[in-house]
Amino acid sequence: MADVKKQSFQDMLDYVHLYRLKNKLHRETADNDRKIRDNQKRVLLLDNLNQYINDSMTVEDIRAIIANMRDDYENRVDDYMIRNAELSKQRREIRQKMAAHKTSASEKSEK
């Protein structure tokens, strides 16, 4: 009986750990969504800025700098999207483990 209670308590601790980890990953995903949105706005800003700059006003180096900045922002957006996919995969795995915990706990309580 003591072993069953100890295992049940350990299962509960595992479940709480998984629940907290899932919430942490959810917060990270939301943070990455904000970063994606911010960097997409920066890309749009640089596109608009590039439309207003003409060769008579500035040097060609300015265009090269803007192009580099745009590429950097686009790369950041891609990196955040990849990270979000990884976080979503981890959250899905955690949800599956939590569901397995629930089913095993209900089976144990029925016995």
UniProtKB/Swiss-Prot annotation:
It is found in: Cytoplasm. Residues 92-111 are annotated as: Disordered. Keywords: Coiled coil, Cytoplasm. It comes from the Bacteria. InterPro entries: DUF496 (IPR007458). Residues 70-104 form a coiled coil. Its main location: cytoplasm. One of its GO terms (cellular component) is cytosol. It holds the Pfam family DUF496. Pole-localizer protein involved in the regulation of several cellular processes. HAMAP family: Pole_loc_TmaR. Belongs to the pole-localizer TmaR family. This is Pole-localizer protein TmaR.
